[in-house]
Design a protein with these regions (language model features):
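Bacterial N-terminal signal peptides that target proteins for export
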Residues: 1-7
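Solvent-exposed loop and edge beta-strand segments that line ligand/cofactor-binding
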Residues: 43-63, 70, 74, 117-136, ...
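Extended ligand-binding groove/face enriched in aromatic
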Residues: 54, 75-230, 353-362
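Terminal, non-catalytic domain-edge segments
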Residues: 21-53, 142-186, 233, 237, ...
Length: 408
């Protein structure tokens, strides 16, 4: 069934357009329309930065809003969308523990024994505060914005339209440079001293005491990818600037071994459709990855692949797409897709979903035949009506598909 026919049926059932409050997807094929762009732009103006300075900026609404704006800026090059992305990044950076005033919840002592440049992952009442390699995700979000600015030199000397409330830099380039500087600062002062085990090929490990979270264990893969995302995007920014080649080399020497480590942990399998798939652990040495956390593995694979730098080919990522499309989506239990990458379902994070988590939409790049099925899952569960990242990713993938067809 064509995507336009799908939407005709859906619209007939609802007697209304597919709306995420103010957001609209008019069809799943053709170019992204100005109506779709305007609706997204209007909607995000009503979505304020979330309260707090913790994981809400990792995998919560704050971090996801940044990524969504970036994708829609790639589609539209609409400066108002970039400005909203900058707004979220500014709010996030301003709330970093060492920058945020104590009376607002900052200046917390972290498990390492002092105030650290992190966004604490523990609740505000936990002492000492927790933080780990997931800090990479905030850096990745912020430097996605920096990358988009650096890719558009016509913006560099223009004043940022929304102003500079936190003195991060009044022009677009100055703002990008500040984001890069602060990202490198967190890597230098938090990540490198604690989480890179040089004696084991620069792999990501949690330290021992006084850290109590997974002490001396490998980082779970979803968290590992969050850190890899940060390093990849910082490398991309430094390449665009053609600066700090020593740092690029040092980051590459961390990124590639950790990607290789992940790839070496994969266990090949075959789906009921006969496609090559993989299973892997949530964290080494054993176990089975759940589909909540595997979403971040998928996002990380895409970010590294898109950079074109880390020996990941199109064919390397097809089995991950097969795993999600043929095993996870192909196994329905009590109305939900499988909760683990082997097709089984458990509870909690392994309980499964009746929708497609937004990060998995990247995998439609490698299984274009499944894009409409993914979109139908979002539509039928009402996710398009409420999810900024899902709507943005669907429109972004729609745009890529249209441009590929137009280029043929």
């Amino acid at each position: 069934m064509s995507s336009r026919a799908l939407f005709v049926i859906f619209l007939a059932m609802t007697a209304a357009p597919v709306i995420a409050q103010n957001m609209v997807i008019e069809s799943l094929d053709g170019p992204v329309t100005q109506t779709e762009i305007n609706a997204f732009k209007a909607h995000i103006q009503t979505v304020n930065a979330p309260e707090g300075n913790g994981n809400v900026w990792v995998f919560g609404n704050g971090g996801k809003s940044i990524e969504a704006c970036g994708l829609m800026y790639e589609v539209s090059h609409d400066r108002a969308i970039l400005d909203r992305m900058i707004y979220y990044c500014d709010e996030m950076l301003s709330r970093r523990n060492d920058l945020w005033p104590a009376e607002k919840g900052g200046q917390r002592i972290v498990w390492a024994g002092k105030i650290e440049p992190v966004w604490p992952s523990s609740n505000p009442d936990v002492k000492p505060a927790g933080a780990g390699v997931e800090q990479g995700d905030e850096i990745a979000h912020m430097n996605y914005c920096a990358k988009l600015i650096l890719q558009n030199p016509s913006l560099w000397n223009e004043k940022v339209t929304i102003g500079d409330a936190y003195n991060f830099g009044d022009t677009y380039k100055a703002r990008a440079l500040r984001y890069i500087k602060e990202g490198d600062y967190v890597i230098d002062n938090w990540i490198l001293p604690h989480f890179i085990r040089s004696s084991e090929g620069n792999h990501y490990y949690f330290p021992g005491a006084p850290n109590t979270y997974k002490a001396n264990e490998p980082a779970p893969w979803n968290q590992a990818w969050m850190l890899t995302n940060a390093l990849v995007r910082l490398v991309e920014c430094h390449l665009l600037l053609n600066d700090d080649h020593k740092r690029i080399t040092s980051y590459d020497a961390i990124i590639q071994p950790n990607i290789n480590w992940f790839i070496s942990s994969l266990r090949p399998s075959t789906s009921a459709k006969g496609t090559l798939c993989y299973t892997w652990a949530y964290a080494l040495p054993r176990g089975m990855e759940d589909t909540n956390h595997a979403a971040y593995d998928s996002e990380g694979l895409w970010i590294a692949y898109e950079s074109g730098r880390y020996k990941l080919t199109f064919n390397d990522l097809v089995p991950f797409a097969n795993t999600y499309c043929d095993v996870v989506m192909g196994t329905i239990t009590n109305g939900k897709f499988a909760g683990r990458v082997d097709g089984s379902t458990g509870v909690g994070h392994a309980g499964g979903d009746n929708f497609v988590r937004d990060e998995y939409i990247y995998l439609a790049e490698f299984r274009p035949d499944m894009f409409e099925d993914m979109a139908k899952a979002e539509i039928s569960t009402g996710k398009v009506a409420v999810s900024v990242p899902i709507t943005a990713r669907l429109l972004w993938e729609k745009d890529r598909r249209y441009k590929k067809r137009a280029a043929k």
